[in-house]
Amino acid sequence: MKNKLRHIIKSCLPHGYIVNRKRNCFLDDYDTWKRSGNSNITFDSHCIFDSFVTIDGYGCSGSSAIMDLLREYDTCTVWASKPAYASNTEIMNGGIYGEFDLCRHTGGLLYIEHMMKEEAWVNDFWADNAVKNFIQAIYYSDIYQNYPSTRPLFFTFFEHITDQRIRCSMPQLNVWQHRFTGLNDIFTLKKMSKTEYYELCRHFLYSLFNMLFADKISGKTLVLDHIFGDCGDDMSRFEPYLPNIKRIIVTRDVRAVYVHACQKNTEWLAHDSVEAFVKWERKMHYRSKHESDNNTLELQFEDIMLNYDREVAKVEQFLGFTSQHHTARKTYLNPEISKSNVFSWRDDKLYATDCDRIKELIPEYCYG
């Protein structure tokens, strides 16, 4: 009843009010930290992890299967969405779960990099917007909310990217952006080269990982969920942020994705018509032009379940692992159980005609 009442109240309040309350709390936290006298922080230049792997997918494509597979290796520490088998006790005892969104989301590290370009640096409106989006993204992040010990790292990064904070009582600079109503301070971005920005981000991420996993490291390869986005760009684009990073992309029969989206009404995945879905999938797959990228491995979800040993061998070769590292084999990913999901989309006859049409339009993304 309490949750229902909270939902009703939130639906009545202007969205901008909620957002600004959150954003202003970040600045309040920051100001308190500055007054504490403990604000002299230097980021780590080395990381406790030797290498990194990001697991990407095209949306409901089964990438969590590879996350579960890599949990079984003693060489890996996995940071991913909470698995079904993780108890609430595990989470309360320090389990770290969730997609890593600090880089890819609006206001994240990649966004700030884009805004660091000369055009944004000289445009006060864009710079102010960039900093406020950063504040919003950080305050809403699970890491900031659930791991308060990391907050000084975010405050320090905030200081590094902002050149000036002008305290104002007049209406905010970007008056047309209602979500910024009530936040009247004006921010400017610090001018820095790409090399300087990459180093800042790299050391910030190292410090964050070192703090979060200081006593939880189970392997020297950190596995992350969609750290830089959804399959786009050659991995060399992201190496300045995290050296020694590789990517595994999991794709799936798009008919299975479509039926799942329809059954669950997955609103962020276009499925109101076959045409809309096909357009979405073409766009998602088009962005992943990585044929010459030696640091990317693409796997088919169906093959992982039906040709388990062969696909596992591919993963091991790609990451430089051996079968001896696979110490918890089939503990988290059991193909004998999971393969029941391979052709389950055929069972729902309601979407049979749609699936036939999808096969006609994009056969290259269908399996079998």
Model-inferred region functions:
Residues K2-I48, F52-V53, K289, N294, ...:
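PAPS-dependent sulfotransferases, especially Golgi type II membrane carbohydrate sulfotransferases
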Residues M1-Y198, N334:
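PAPS-dependent sulfotransferase catalytic core
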Residues G98-L109, L269-A276, S344-T353:
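A polyampholytic, Gly/Pro-enriched intrinsically disordered region
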Residues A80-A84, T251, H326-K330:
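A generic structural motif
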Residues W126-Q136, E298-D303, I337-T353:
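Short secondary-structure transition/capping segments
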Residues P152-H326:
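PAPS-dependent sulfotransferase catalytic domain
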Residues T89-G95, H260-Q263, R310-V312, K339-N341:
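Short aromatic-enriched loop/helix-cap "lid" or pocket-rim segments at secondary-structure transitions
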